[in-house]
Structures are given as C-alpha cells and as structure tokens.
Amino acid sequence: MAADCTVHKLVADLALFSGDRVLLVKYKDVRRYDGQRGWFLPDDHLRHEEHPVDAAKRIATEQAGHAVPDVRLSHIESFGDGAWHLIFHYRAELKPGAHVTPAGNVKVAEWFPLTGLPEPSAVAHHGWALDVLKAMAGGSR
C-alpha cells in the first residue's frame, strides 16, 4: 500500500447459497461500487463501529429481504486499487427455493446455479465475485 493512500474502505460481502445456487445482485446507483456495473455478491461498506458479522447480516436483510442468524467468515482479502480495501467475505445458507425481494439500492437479484455462473465480463470488477466464490469452494461448504 502506498504511503500516500488516503482512502480506506472496509467492506463485507455475503455469498447467500440456496441449495446449489448463489445469489448475485446488480445495483441501481453504482457510485458506491467504484462505478462498476454487472453482477456482485451482495456487499456494502461497514458502518462506523459496525462489526463485520453484523454488516453481513444487515446486507442479507437490506439487500435480499432475509434475516440470516448464522453467517460464517470464509476469508479476508486486502488490496489497493487507488484506495486500500479490506474485504470480509462471508457465506450463509437459505432454504432451497428461497425467494428474494430486491430492496434498497438493489436493482436486480437473481439466483444462479453454481455450475452456470455468468461470464466474467458480466460480473463487476472483471469477474471478482467469481474469484471469491472459487476461493470459497476451496473450503468446506
């Protein structure tokens, strides 16, 4: 990280699984997402003094309309890209066939089979959510 980095972003994302499917979303206002369009795992910045676990649970409620009592940390990622990012990657399970209602800044929420995910070019940040899901697959599901 460059010594002159003045922007720091703490972010949580949540891979919501329902059976063999994962939820991806597209946002209405992409300014908070580095102007990126395309599919994302539901995510948001951490609020002041918010624990990452609480952020992941909030994201499930605010963006997918589901309260999830149990989220599990998959891994943490850190990178600089003009701003330093620390990303907490969480996962949670919903019952098979769960219906989601896009809310807040979510324009579209769609379940994708794990064997039929979108092409990287259709996923924000050059397919980053696909890389996160691949890293999660290396662990227990």
Model-derived regions: residue spans:
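A conserved beta-turn-beta hairpin within the catalytic core of GNAT-like acetyltransferases
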Residues: R31-R37
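Unchanged
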Residues: D44-P69, E77-W128
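Short coil/turn motifs at beta-sheet boundaries
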Residues: V7, D34, D81-H85
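Charged phosphate-binding loop/patch that engages nucleotide di/tri-phosphates or the phosphate backbone
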Residues: G127-R141
